[in-house]
Swiss-Prot record:
One of its GO terms (cellular component) is hemoglobin complex. InterPro entries: Globin (IPR000971), Globin-like_sf (IPR009050), Globin/Proto (IPR012292), Hemoglobin_b (IPR002337), Hemoglobin_oxygen_transport (IPR050056). This is a minor early embryonic beta chain. The gene is Hbb-bh0. This is Hemoglobin subunit beta-H0. The keyword Metal-binding applies. Heterotetramer of two alpha chains and two beta chains. Residues 3-147 form the Globin domain.
Length: 147
């Protein structure tokens, strides 16, 4: 179980409250597919993924990125109970989608990079540490069914 201090929770929620789910989610997922092209195999029904421009302009990528960040909002609201919060999604990604659990870590790291880009100086080292802790906790919770 991951324990978050009051300061870490505040750092996470202060950024989260300002996140544009569609923009940040779409960019995060799009960058994941560009930087780690082997992840594209999980999105073969999403249409044209032939170039960075095609990926970043793909409305299905943007929509799914928003969906991913909407789910991440559950983590922000349930930081002290990540394993139970993501039990269903862990089962879905393991049993039905057969997603590589390593990709959860890659996506989390990509989100931290995108948040840093969007929030600049407001995304302090302390905020980054708190967010990194959160995305690692979420990746671990999503990977639980695999063990």
């Amino acid at each position: 179980m991951v324990h978050f201090t009051a300061e870490e929770k505040a750092a996470i929620t202060s950024i989260w409250d300002k996140v544009d789910l569609e923009k940040v989610g779409g960019e995060t997922l799009g960058r994941l597919l560009i930087v780690y092209p082997w992840t594209q195999r999980f999105f073969d029904k999403f249409g044209n993924l032939s170039s960075a421009q095609a990926i970043m302009g793909n409305p299905r990528i943007k929509a799914h990125g928003k969906k991913v960040l909407t789910s991440l909002g559950l983590a922000v609201k349930n930081m002290d109970n990540l394993k139970e919060t993501f039990a269903h999604l862990s089962e879905l990604h393991c049993d039905k989608l057969h997603a590589d659990p390593e990709n959860f870590k890659l996506l989390g790291n990509m989100l931290v990079i995108v948040l840093s880009s969007y929030f600049g100086k407001e995304f302090t080292a302390e905020a980054q540490a708190a967010w990194q802790k959160l995305v690692v906790g979420v990746a671990t919770a999503l990977s639980h069914k695999y063990h």
